[in-house]
């Protein structure tokens, strides 16, 4: 019976199409001059001159007018012919201008009446949403929002409510191009997948978004710990942003927002399209993941306004850049044109989100001074991800990490550091860490979160190309260990000896891999003393000192 129901659901999903407006929408969806250059222009401000804000996806869903326009414009965008340079297929989901244009077109198609004006008003300040994958979901809701889960949805539009293909569930290739997509079996699938479940349908497996939800939720504690460390101790833009910079400069602090971002690619895809670098942008999740990453970068910039991009050599060839060529803030960001005369955007010209006509609620300067915003964000960072988590764990475990008579609190942050060649294996892989012996079933490691007395304590995900670019770039990532030590009741003076005895790691690609086969792999454990003043929201970090080498 369950199998029959599954097949019926698949049949309904296959039959569902885009929204039917009752008119030919090809001319509306296409740009007026398909032969002209695609120029990335700033989106317009509101009538009162303010910069519209990008909302979190659950916040947008609460506004039915904006939500309808978002789903309808996503659906229309995905429906554009793959031959069009402005189609989802060719742009692969990173061009917000098209969504804004389509939202305004669709708003104008609603029949006259109160709702039509509400849709037109919503379209004026329409901006892409983000999904906040660093915050726990509201009570009673799934961590991975349920708007991604269902293949079909009932959607209101200018012609009333219709059952359509959910544009957040997948992108359907039209036509499927097996030659371009290269990887087997992904090349044979007609739509993007997440955690493809071949037990239901082998030729065209369904996406298992329940598995994606469980695995991503298991990674939330380490994501929040890593973000707290990044936002409280990384003051250099290159170090914060780039997973190749620290190794190239022989730095001791080896994390980056790029490395944290890799977690959502690997575990949001789980062997589906998000897991593969060249295919990831086809998945609708890519768009919301990268707007969230953009938000985090914007928040860090507001906290560190004087730090900016330093010159760095390109790690591999691209269509316009040779390996080893120095890239700096004035280097053209091809293929993104800023004007019809052939001028490209640069890091300098795109430094602020306002240059593109949007901001975030957390970075909006309306009615604020920059220093006031910086202080506000310092408090928010601690509230979102921060040090109170350590202090709470410490109190609950009965471990005092500082003198009670002191106004300051101290603890030692232990961190596992990974250095590895970006093309060490043929594509993505992960390094799993354990306190004690790992489970013999490596298929369980991705979902393990250290609860229920299992030994798994975290993962460093490596989102990488297969071995075809000739890159010899070394990259890095980290895993904070302190929370796992506190949860196990390890006294501060015993931490180092405990880690020497118990800390283990395993490498997992498509299956378990011998570490000796992983090019450039180096793992050590370092620690830093952290001070938290009683009246401060900002931890002060001591020098990071290497204590042991796990693999070299």
Predicted regions mapped to residue ranges:
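C-terminal accessory segments of proteins
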Residues: 17-552
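Cleavable N-terminal signal peptides of Sec/SRP-targeted secreted and luminal proteins
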Residues: 1-17
């Amino acid at each position: 019976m369950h199998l029959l129901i599954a097949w019926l659901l698949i049949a309904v999903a296959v039959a569902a199409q885009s929204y039917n407006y009752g008119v030919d929408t090809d001319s509306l969806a296409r740009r007026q001059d398909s032969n002209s250059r695609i120029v990335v222009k700033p989106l317009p401000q509101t009538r009162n001159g303010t910069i519209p804000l990008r909302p979190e996806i659950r916040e947008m869903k609460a506004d039915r007018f904006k939500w309808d326009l978002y789903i309808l414009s996503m659906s229309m965008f995905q429906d554009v012919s793959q031959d069009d340079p402005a189609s989802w297929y060719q742009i692969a989901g990173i061009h917000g201008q098209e969504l804004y244009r389509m939202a305004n077109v669709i708003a104008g198609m609603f029949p006259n009446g109160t709702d039509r004006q509400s849709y037109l008003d919503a379209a004026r300040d329409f901006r892409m949403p983000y999904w906040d994958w660093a915050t726990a979901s509201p009570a009673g809701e799934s961590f991975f929002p349920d708007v991604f889960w269902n293949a079909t949805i009932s959607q209101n539009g200018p012609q009333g409510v219709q059952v359509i293909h959910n544009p957040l569930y997948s992108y359907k290739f039209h036509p499927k191009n097996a030659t371009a997509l290269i990887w087997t079996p992904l090349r044979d699938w007609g739509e993007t997948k997440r955690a493809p479940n071949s037990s239901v349908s082998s030729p065209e497996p369904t996406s298992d978004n329940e598995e994606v939800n469980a695995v991503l939720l298991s990674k939330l504690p380490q994501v929040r710990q890593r973000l707290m460390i990044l936002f409280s101790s990384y003051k250099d833009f290159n170090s914060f942003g780039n997973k190749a910079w620290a190794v190239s400069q022989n730095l001791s602090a080896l994390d980056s927002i790029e490395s944290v971002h890799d977690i959502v690619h690997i575990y949001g895809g789980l062997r589906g399209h998000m897991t593969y670098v060249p295919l990831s942008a086809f998945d609708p999740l890519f768009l919301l993941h990268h707007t969230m990453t953009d938000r985090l970068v914007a928040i860090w910039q507001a906290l560190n306004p004087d730090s900016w991009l330093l010159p760095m050599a390109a790690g591999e060839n691209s269509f316009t850049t040779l390996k080893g060529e120095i890239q700096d803030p004035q280097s053209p960001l091809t293929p993104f044109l800023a004007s019809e005369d052939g001028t490209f955007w640069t890091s300098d010209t795109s430094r602020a989100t306002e240059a593109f006509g949007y901001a975030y609620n957390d970075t909006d300067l309306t009615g604020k001074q920059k220093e006031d915003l910086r202080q506000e964000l310092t408090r928010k960072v601690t509230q979102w991800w921060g040090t109170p988590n350590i202090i709470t764990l410490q109190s609950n475990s009965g471990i005092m990490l500082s003198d009670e008579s002191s106004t300051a609190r101290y603890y030692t942050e232990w961190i596992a550091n990974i250095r590895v060649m970006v093309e060490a294996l043929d594509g993505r892989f992960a390094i799993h860490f354990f306190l004690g012996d790992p489970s013999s079933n490596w298929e369980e490691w991705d979902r393990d979160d250290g609860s229920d007395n299992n030994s798994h304590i975290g993962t460093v995900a490596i989102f990488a190309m297969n071995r075809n670019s000739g890159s010899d770039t070394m990259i890095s990532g980290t895993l904070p260990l302190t929370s796992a030590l506190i949860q196990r009741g390890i006294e501060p003076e015993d931490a180092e000896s405990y880690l020497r005895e118990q800390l283990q790691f395993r490498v997992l690609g498509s299956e378990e891999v011998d570490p000796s086969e992983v090019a450039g792999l180096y793992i050590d454990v370092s620690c830093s003393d952290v001070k938290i003043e009683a009246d401060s929201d900002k931890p002060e970090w001591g020098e990071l000192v290497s204590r042991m080498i796990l693999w070299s």
